[in-house]
Amino acid sequence: MGYRAAGKSTTGNSILGREEFDLKTPAQCVRRHGEVADRHITIIEAPGWWRSYTVEKSPELLKQEIVLSVSLCPPGPHAVLLIIRVDDRFKESHRKALQGHLDLLGERVWSHTIVLFTHGDSLLDTSIEQHIESEVQDLQWLLDKCGNRYHVLNNKNRSDDTQIKELLEKIEETVAQNNGCHFQIDRKILQEIKERRRAEEERAEERIKRMKKQSENIRSQMSDTQHFSELRIVLMGYKEAGKSSSGNSILGRDEFDLKTSAQCLRRHGEVADRHVTVIEAPGWWSDFTVEESPELLKEEILLSVSLCPPGPHAVLLIIRVDIGFKENERKALQGHLDLLSERVWNHTIVLFTCGDSLLDTSIEQQIESEGQDLEWLLDKCGNRYHVLNNKNRSDNTQIKELLMKIEETVAQNNGFHFQIDRKILQEMKERKRAEEQRAEERMKRMKKQRENIRSQMSDAQRLSELRIVLMGYRTAGKSSTGNSILGREEFDLKASAQCVRRHGEVADRHITVIEAPGWWMNEPVEESPELLKQEIVLSVSLCPPGPHAVLLIIRVDIGFKETERKALQGHLDLLGERVWSHTIVLFTHGDSLLDTSIEQHIESEGEDLQWLLDKCGNRYHVLNNQNRIDDTQIKELLEKIEETVTQNNGCHFEIDRKILQETDGRKKMKEQIDKWREDIRSLTSE
């Protein structure tokens, strides 16, 4: 058992001493046998999950296979080997994913589980115990959960059979710890899965027959003249769904860059005797509603269908087949597609990517197992769907079949392509022109403002020390920003409940960075815990005499509306009105902008973001935390902090002592109450 690429197949081969397991990722359980060290060994390899994806994000078929795996070696396995790579850091997200998937088997499975570390050769002279102690608490939690049973395997060194003999001994010890018993799953859980699987397979067969008949009926109504010499296609879907790869597969060459684009891309090519135009629209976050997406993204989705005039023959809605599709994804997808009007669904085909992960499983089995949200989507699209394996470009039959399905879609629409309401398109184009004009003006204003400030600054005003507080909602990118500023991994990416202080030398300055804990993005200050509010107030006192700037962190790839603005305003107001004069808005995820200027994003996003920038004296900066080697973005940020100090007559921010004393007093009182409660508990227990 384990995540993808952990080394399950290689481990199975090492145990059996020969190549029995295919190194391709299986979609179903694989069973193999062999004689090892005078024992008959049966090994079941369960399919793996994506390492950082919670169990809720995994497809239903995968979850069923995990449950079924322990029934394939009756009466049950003597041990479950939980495979983890020793050369990869084990993070909280990995622990949560692993825990969720193993919990499908019930709580008792942990008593029969051994953690098996692969890539043991990477340890060199380091012992596995040293590695475990050097890792954070998540790995230690896992080992505690498994009764501290673990083993290291070097799959590259097959000749060393002592490591396999020792592993088999540890499995026997595990059985002894369980009073000689193997693991047995609750029969009720297993029976339910088997019954559900049978029903799904029946429905999948019926679906295959229905789809075949539907296609035959459409083809019989089409004449030879309805074979198109030109096809216009729009690719739509969430980020990382595989839009660019699909575009490249359709055109048969690398035309689309696999980087996420902020704007629509248009490419052409000759495919199967047709001139094909493909438009790739930028994607949204898979479980973010349309209200949470930036306005620029929504504008691009609307524009996409106008870039292949007179309109696309089909919209291909891209979904990964190796990731679960639930209500959140369905709502996000529905909201974004509805921007194009209700009529777009008549021209839409669902295109499943990562088809290679299905192997011997039919797409119909996947659909029937996944549940009502995916079925709703297919019904909405007139049950038009196709599976693509973007890794197998040489198989051009999958593309020919897709183009035929697009022609069938046109036939279902009486020979018509999709055309967006001209009024909607015209209004959007006019709005975009006005935004671009305002963006140009803003850029000039900001440039002039900075030049004026710099002209007032003398060389003596270049500060040798800078004190910075990072403030913002959870997942905004505060820790990553702190690491980018200091040029190294100083802040843990886990959410912290308390302020964290770090120091470093950057661009000939001594920098102190305080990271304050974040609030929930849409939650007003009244709903935040008192401890969080206290930490926000205390943050500015942790770099005495006070910070030169407060960096207010906001993600540029997420919409900023009234709820976010109110939450942010409420939390920052805890520090008093004067804090706004020392605040700079720092946009993270700058890489998602690409060729779009930050000014265009600001002008398109609307009044709430503009209110915030006005409140901060129009001080802002964009950071791409993925590009650490570009130190110009950090140097420019430090210059903007110095300019902020100049705007404040050389003064740093200092919180009203009364606010600080009140907060400090409340914190001390809470600590005293907690101590009293602890004392009472200890006396009661005695």
Predicted regions and their residues:
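Glycine-rich, N-terminal phosphate-binding loop of Rossmann-like dinucleotide-binding domains
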Residues: 84-85, 319-320, 554-555
